[in-house]
């Protein structure tokens, strides 16, 4: 996961939100960023093949830690990104219960640069503070009037204001 849920919960903007809700939003943002940039942020120096079953990868690397994100590929059925929850000498436990038994999975560590992490925190703040105001252009109550930034197809990407996504520009990869 790009940002640890506990990190967000410690911030005042996210007090009162459920861990599961934050986790789900973070996973959605992570997948959206990977698709939008066409960049999987893999550290190909930390890569190995291993068997999978249930919630375990039967293999390891000395360069992986609890909380790291890995990508499983070339399995046919388990492809995706997962977070490590436990590491033992025999296996790595992931944040899922539904890995199919496959003998050859390519496991690669995923690392996000610091500016991506900060950008995701800013996106999450926007999500919490402004998502419910999307679609409302202005409000008036008696003599008090509030006008919001107009969001249309020209200035939004993936449901977020284009100005908030500038941090992704250096990581865009060409699509062929």
Which residue stretches match the model-derived regions?
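Conserved short "hinge" loops at termini or chain/domain junctions
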Residues: 1-118, 131, 152-176
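Glycine-rich and polybasic anion-binding loops at the starts of cofactor/ligand-binding domains
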Residues: 121
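Short Cys/His-centered divalent metal-binding micro-motifs
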Residues: 124
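Short acidic, Pro/Gly- and aromatic-enriched capping/linker segments at domain boundaries
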Residues: 129-137
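Non-catalytic terminal accessory segments
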Residues: 147-149
């Amino acid at each position: 996961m790009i940002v640890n849920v506990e990190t967000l919960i410690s911030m005042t903007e996210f007090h009162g939100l459920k861990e599961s809700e934050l986790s789900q939003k973070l996973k959605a943002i992570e997948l959206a960023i990977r698709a939008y940039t066409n960049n999987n942020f893999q550290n190909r120096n930390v890569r190995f093949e291993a068997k999978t079953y249930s919630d375990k990868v039967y293999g390891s690397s000395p360069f992986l830690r609890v909380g790291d994100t890995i990508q499983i590929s070339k399995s046919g059925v388990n492809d995706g990104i997962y977070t490590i929850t436990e590491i033992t000498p025999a296996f790595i436990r992931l944040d899922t219960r539904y890995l199919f038994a496959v003998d050859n999975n390519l496991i690669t560590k995923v690392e996000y640069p610091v500016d991506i992490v900060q950008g995701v925190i800013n996106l999450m703040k926007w999500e919490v503070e402004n998502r419910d105001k999307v679609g409302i252009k202005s409000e008036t109550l008696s003599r008090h009037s509030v006008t919001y930034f107009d969001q249309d197809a020209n200035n939004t990407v993936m449901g977020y204001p284009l100005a908030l996504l500038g941090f992704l520009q250096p990581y865009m990869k060409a699509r062929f």
